[in-house]
Design a protein with these regions (language model features):
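Residue-level recognition of beta-strand->loop/alpha-helix junctions
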Residues: 51-53, 125
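Acidic/histidine-rich helix-loop elements
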Residues: 17-28, 53-57, 88-97
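Alpha-helical cap/lid subdomain in secreted, periplasmic
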Residues: 2, 32-46, 61-129
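Glycine-rich beta-strand-to-loop/alpha-helix junction loops that act as flexible
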Residues: 9-11, 55, 82-84
Length: 129
């Protein structure tokens, strides 16, 4: 049976109330439903799902966690939802993160992932209602 390790990373959307002492607890958000879908769609694959999303995280936090919470885990697939905390909480104050810094941090994350896994694919499509 083929094994695939899928890592969910990001902010509160990924955290979704997960238990921090159990990285295999997927909370009550999209990681839980994505895992259920994938298990049903691909029953011949032995998935290991890991959720390390942390509510309130920004791109700079993920950069700080790259080694321990991305590279050392050696995932086959990575799902990242991050960015809203970089802009939402600071839209009206002086701690706003400039676009170029946000972009640089995001590129650091993506490059680290793309160089640490054997296959890379990036989808920037957003859901359409």
């Amino acid at each position: 049976m083929k094994k695939i390790k899928l890592l969910f990373q990001g902010d509160s959307i990924t955290d979704a109330g997960r238990e921090y002492n159990d990285c295999h607890n997927l909370g009550e958000g999209y990681p839980k439903y994505a895992a259920k879908y994938l298990k049903n769609k691909f029953p011949d694959i032995d998935f290991e799902f890991i959720d390390l999303g942390i509510s309130g995280n920004q791109t700079k936090d993920l950069v700080g966690r790259l080694q321990n919470d991305f590279i050392d885990i050696k995932p086959d697939i990575v799902s990242i939802l991050i960015g809203i905390n970089d802009v939402w909480h600071h839209a009206d104050d002086k701690s706003w993160i400039p676009n170029d810094i946000f972009e640089d941090q995001y590129r650091i994350i993506l490059n680290a992932i793309l160089f640490s896994i054997t296959q890379g694919y990036m989808n920037t499509d957003t859901a359409k209602c």
